[in-house]
Amino acid sequence: MAGKFCSFCGRDIQQVERLIAGPNNVYICNECIDLFHDLLRSDRKVRIKNEIKEIPTPAEIKAELDKYIIGQERAKKVLSVAVYNHYKRVFSNLDSNDVEIEKSNVLLIGPTGTGKTYLARILAKILNVPFAIADATPLTEAGYVGEDVENVVLRLLEAANFDVERAQYGIIYIDEIDKIAKKSPNPSITRDVSGEGVQQALLKILEGTIANVPPQGGRKHPYQEFIKVDTRNILFIAGGAFDGLEEIIKRRIQSTTMGFGAEIKSKKEMRLGEILKHVTPDDLVQYGLIPEFVGRFPVIATLDDLSEDDLVRILKEPKNAVVRQYQKLFEIDGVKLEVTDEALRIIARKALKRGTGARALKNVFEEMMIDMMFELPNLKNVEKVVITEEVALGKEKPIVVMRESA
């Protein structure tokens, strides 16, 4: 290759490590390849940053959350600050060799149906980033029947249509994280494959590593080619109900205040959310999470259990409230839907009794409306449908108001 030179930088073969030949006597050297690779990566990062747009301030993030989520003021503030700091860290460190700011993964603790998953989903929508939900329950450590922890990242890749660069700036919500707590604080002869082993396996991914992700889901396809995903800039939000954690917290609070004349509220006097606000990392370790795992979640936010008043507001106030959704469905048929305040309270009361929080609201409403929704398309000249307290109690049918004939 004497006399050959790079068509891009002009250096000859003696000045570079390697010269690669192309068609029509065109050559490119290894240094130009590295340069162009860096340029392409830089362009992709700029594209991703532009897609995420300007990072909203914590106040702006919370204002958007307020449109969809009723109550949970403290949790919304904590999440807004954590997400803002996360993406500020991501984009300030893209080309920086200065101080490295640690990740601000978030742990959400709260009763079932209080909006943990929904909070994470709305955050991703606000920021225009890929979002995926993974269930911690089927995860097991390598070598055991179940799902590999890398499948958590696979969910995000799928949500990003396998655009690796875009996925690397996404949000992953790991649900039921409390289910991988150690079953016992004492080590046993039998391996706890769904507990401590899974926590250990998740550590690297949570902190930031190059994960080898199986595009076809892992163990059933052992010979597939892995996709490398850098998890350093992925925000992990984990959530769980942590049933029984309140007892650990109460015991600690009572032992530290004993003998000082402090008034201890009984369990009946304290709402669950009020107790959970006092959680510490040590409480989580006692619950069954290993210290290293707890350390990967520097931000902890607790959610309040929902009251009847909260559920009434959730029914009608958010941007996508259940009542608004049904009113829109009726509107498409040219019919107004009216739900009285008394009916809303009965619906909220029924949902509260089911013990699954806000997620029960739509079920209760659907059960009440199914017959009306079935009959409505066949009815002519209907102006309005009214849902009263008696209808919500199941004692009467919805009131159908007909249009006056011209």
Swiss-Prot record:
Protein name (record): ATP-dependent Clp protease ATP-binding subunit ClpX
Keyword line: ATP-binding, Chaperone, Metal-binding, Nucleotide-binding, Zinc
Stated role: ATP-dependent specificity component of the Clp protease. It directs the protease to specific substrates. Can perform chaperone functions in the absence of ClpP.
Superkingdom as given in the UniProt entry: Bacteria
Domain ClpX-type ZB as annotated: residue spans: 1-48
Species the sequence originates in: Thermotoga maritima (strain ATCC 43589 / DSM 3109 / JCM 10099 / NBRC 100826 / MSB8)
GO MF terms held by the record: ATP binding; ATP hydrolysis activity; ATP-dependent protein folding chaperone; protein dimerization activity; unfolded protein binding; zinc ion binding
Similarity field: Belongs to the ClpX chaperone family.
InterPro entries: AAA+_ATPase, ATP-dep_Clp_protease_ClpX, ATPase_AAA_core, Clp_ATPase_C, Clp_protease_ATP-bd_su_ClpX, ClpX_bact, P-loop_NTPase, Znf_CppX_C4
Keyword set includes Lyase: no
Residues binding ATP, per UniProt: 111-118
Record NCBIfam families: clpX, PRK05342.1
Residues annotated for Zn(2+) binding in this entry: 6, 9, 29, 32
BP GO annotations: cell division; proteolysis involved in protein catabolic process
Subunit structure: Component of the ClpX-ClpP complex. Forms a hexameric ring that, in the presence of ATP, binds to fourteen ClpP subunits assembled into a disk-like structure with a central cavity, resembling the structure of eukaryotic proteasomes.
PROSITE patterns to which the protein is assigned, alphabetical: CLPX_ZB
